[in-house]
């Protein structure tokens, strides 16, 4: 059976949004927004791994309760200057992992 992967670009700084923290780390229902998105993907039985593309200097990721999401998460700190670059970098990291 083929493996399916999710790739979540989360390297943005949210500078246009104007908040003190990147918008993926803003809280909703007591948890960062990114937690809710990742939890939904981790619950999906068809997805083998959830790759999260983060910026190299991401200071907020360590605060996310990722252990409660199980072992599917694969954070990679290779975000680019744009979302497209982050996705390309994440796909390259995933491709290298699978090679």
Where are these regions (language model features)?
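N-terminal glycine-rich phosphate-binding loop and ensuing alpha1 helix
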Residues: 3-59
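Conserved N-terminal catalytic core of the sugar/cofactor nucleotidyltransferase
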Residues: 35-99
């Amino acid at each position: 059976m083929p493996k399916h992967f999710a790739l979540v670009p989360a390297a943005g700084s949210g500078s246009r949004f104007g908040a003190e923290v990147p918008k993926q780390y803003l809280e909703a229902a007591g948890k960062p927004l990114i937690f809710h998105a990742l939890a939904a993907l981790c619950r999906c039985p068809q997805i083998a791994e959830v790759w999260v593309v983060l910026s190299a200097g991401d200071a907020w990721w360590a605060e996310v309760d990722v252990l409660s999401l199980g072992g599917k998460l694969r954070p990679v700190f290779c975000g680019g200057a744009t979302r497209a670059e982050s996705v390309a970098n994440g796909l390259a990291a995933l491709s290298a992992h699978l090679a």
